[in-house]
A protein has these predicted regions:
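Walker A/P-loop-proximal flanking segment of P-loop NTPase domains
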Residues: 1-86, 92-93, 138
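P-loop NTPase nucleotide-binding core
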Residues: 74-77, 81-169
Length: 169
């Protein structure tokens, strides 16, 4: 095990940065450390099996999300369950950054981080984005804020369309 000081992001990550602080979103996304199926800090036995949820490493999870966003899997929904402070917001912000602009320098850095964790998954992810050549609409919602869910989703969709100079009428 080797500590990567160059990947250290000092502080909590806020998913809201995806919409309101591009610089922090970039820094946090570029610092995310993926782990692949060969290295996992815990085992399925550690988290149990009675709940029916399968333990998945972050590189494989990222690949599943990307495949679902581009319609390569039938099940469009997935869920991340983990304890407080385990990096769910950091991972979500990183994936939103990657999917929202897959051809950016930041996304290249994210894909390189996936390749560092698992070269095969990283290569497959890179090829997926080359073939798709279009971004996905990532709606990032901070569940700690009080809002009407339907209104917030609508607001974010309209905001994303306006940002790309698309008509919202």
């Amino acid at each position: 095990v080797k500590f990567r000081g160059d990947r250290l992001f000092n502080g909590a990550v806020n998913i809201s940065w995806a919409n309101n602080d591009a610089q922090k979103a970039k820094l946090a996304s570029e610092s995310f450390v993926f782990h692949g199926p060969k290295y996992h800090g815990i085992t399925q036995q550690d988290v149990g099996v009675s709940h029916g949820h399968k333990l998945v490493d972050t590189a494989s999870f990222a690949m599943k999300i990307a495949r679902r966003c581009y319609g390569h899997e039938e099940q469009p929904f997935t869920m991340a369950i983990a304890g407080y402070g385990t990096g769910k917001s950091h991972l979500a912000l990183t994936l939103a950054t990657l999917l929202g602009n897959p051809n950016s320098e930041t996304s290249n850095a994210i894909i390189d981080a996936v390749k560092a964790a698992d070269p095969e998954i990283g290569k497959e992810l890179s090829l997926l984005f080359q073939e798709a050549s279009q971004p996905c609409l990532a709606i990032t919602i901070n569940g700690m804020q009080g809002f009407d869910l339907a209104a917030e989703v609508s607001r974010q969709i309209a905001s994303a369309l306006k940002k790309d100079n698309l008509d919202t009428k």
